């Protein structure tokens, strides 16, 4: 249970810290990466949801 709580805290912490970068602008040469950069903070949450679905599939063994 502690590991799951730690994982949640890490995901929330990384999402909060990376949200401060939303106000920064990429250099013009990298402007085509903007859509990818906008999605990147969500990736840890997707991994957490994948782990949750996986554990539900094996009945939380």
UniProtKB/Swiss-Prot annotation:
This is Photosystem II reaction center protein K. Residues 1-24 form a propeptide. GO terms for biological process: photosynthesis. Its main location: plastid. One of the components of the core complex of photosystem II (PSII). PSII is a light-driven water:plastoquinone oxidoreductase that uses light energy to abstract electrons from H(2)O, generating O(2) and a proton gradient subsequently used for ATP formation. It consists of a core antenna complex that captures photons, and an electron transfer chain that converts photonic excitation into a charge separation. It is a single-pass membrane protein. It is found in: Plastid, Chloroplast thylakoid membrane. PANTHER family: PHOTOSYSTEM II REACTION CENTER PROTEIN K, PTHR35325. The keyword Transport does not apply.
